[in-house]
Amino acid sequence: MNARQAITPALVTEKAVKRLPRWALLLFCAAYVLPGLFGRDPWKNADIAAFGQMWSLALGQASWWAPHVGGVPPSGGGILPYWLGGAVISALQPWVDPALAARLPFAGLLVAVLSLTWYATYHLARTEAAQPLPLAFGGEAPVPDYARALADGALLALMATLGLLQLGHETTPEMLQLTGSALFTYGLAAAPYRAIKARLATLFSLILLAGSGSPFIAILLAVVGLAVCQRSTEDSMRQHLRWVLLSGILAAGLATGLSWLGLSGWHWRVSGMPNIGAVVRLFLWFTWPALPLAMLTVWSWRRQALRRHIAVPLLSVLIGFGASLAMGGLDRALLHALPPLAVLAAFSLPTIKRGLSSAIDWFSVFFFTGTALLIWVVYGAMYTGWPHSTANNVAKLVPGYAKAFSWPLLLMAAGATLAWLALVRWRTARHQNALWKSVVLPAGGVALGWLLLMTLWLPLMDQSRSYRLLMERIKPHVRVGSCIAAPGASAGLLTALEYFGHYSVDGRANSGTKNCEVLMLSVGGKQKAPTVPGWHLVARERQRTQNSESVAIYRRDH
């Protein structure tokens, strides 16, 4: 028995590497990426705040070297994400709505993250240390088929993570950061097989991270890359070291330049000790089901923990976990851990026990079927008024909800539900040998839930999470085109005033109050509107209920 046979936990037959049909994989990806891309407004809070910075660049209201909305610069995110969104808005106007134009490149980034995770897993699974045990009488899995099956599993595991669902569909700098992280993992994975592509990926990955507000994570990844390349016995990895070093130097230089310009380059965002219970809950739901599978991988492959197929994703995951903890349990920092966590989860599939696999399957069946049923019941209540209690709850949560029935959206939702039932029947009706079988139901359930929300509930969610309703309530009190001083207002509210209300806004501390005839202050749901010397209160409007966000509108005394 050689060394690899002694320490490799995987035993995989040729039947187990059954290929997931490409049409099915593409359908999964389409059902995950496309819903929510069309037919909605920018949503609160980070989504519309980032969109506002991009829109102001496209309109020429702000310098490309100093983006701002109403004089308020972005709170983070570097500069590259705003350039990306602003450039696409500028290129597609006036033919495409600015909000949709801004979402298009970020949907492309989500596709890139999914693709990079697939290819990173594929190349890592081809390494000698990752191969399963050879069978005594033959019939073991061919290397390309084995690698492809694990890559399919990694992609499904990534789509199944609940944390990527909302944040992955936003127009925010975190998506460019996530692309940079995934690109770096791909570079380390593909270096022995696709040298030129791997070098280019590594070179640009850390630059993307530094230019989108995560220079510290870029430097930590560079340290990981240098360590992996330095201890590798492969010449290709040793040669790759210089590209990791060059990328790290360029990333540090870019972050320094952004800081010199007054942007979020070396922006220290470490906060105090987070609540341990809250962090544990965040990590559990945000990373489900990839985290338990990744933990199984670390245990099963513990004797190969220093090999590249385990070390690269594991160290990247630890960086993402550490960044989230350092920022007080920030969920957006935890995004960095998801692609490498999915890669790690894929290597558990050859070793997973039938009991754990069945538990994941049945949990997915009951949880996602129940979620889909709830979505359908609420949808029916919105249009029929039955069940009465459900319809009343919807009316309380979104007062004045305007029904917007759509046959195409209804048919899409019905088709997705039938596809889910067919997938459940396929998975549970007979024993399946494919390695990726344990993650197909979680991925399918997440895709189903997201598609139902973005079809059946899209009008409801759009009215509850968009600023459009609040702007409609403000218009009777403030003439379109008026100048509004809104000191202390969030970038999201400033964007809404310009985009939905067509007002001229100034969010700076004192300058706007000298030039504008209207003053607007954000007021807590139950707080009393403050008295402002030289101004008289005209109205107070709320987004939805008595406890929701509200604004107080003042006019200057004459």
Which sequence ranges carry the predicted segments?
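Membrane-embedded architecture of ER/inner-membrane glycosylation machinery
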Residues: A3-L26, E174, A191-H558
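Aromatic-rich transmembrane-lumenal/periplasmic boundary elements in polytopic membrane proteins
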Residues: A30, L34-W64
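Extracytosolic helix-loop segments that constitute the early lumenal/periplasmic catalytic or substrate-binding loops
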Residues: A50-G76, L80, A87
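Loop-to-helix entry region of an early transmembrane alpha helix in multi-pass inner-membrane enzymes
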Residues: I79, W83, L92-A120, P144-A151, ...
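Membrane-embedded alpha-helical segments of multi-pass membrane proteins
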Residues: L104-A112, M175-L183, H336-L344
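Transmembrane-helix motifs of polytopic, lipid-linked glycan transferases
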Residues: L104-P142, A160, L183
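Hydrophobic/aromatic residues in alpha-helical transmembrane segments
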Residues: T117-A120, L164, F184, A294, ...
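Short helix- or helix-capping micro-motifs
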Residues: A154-M159
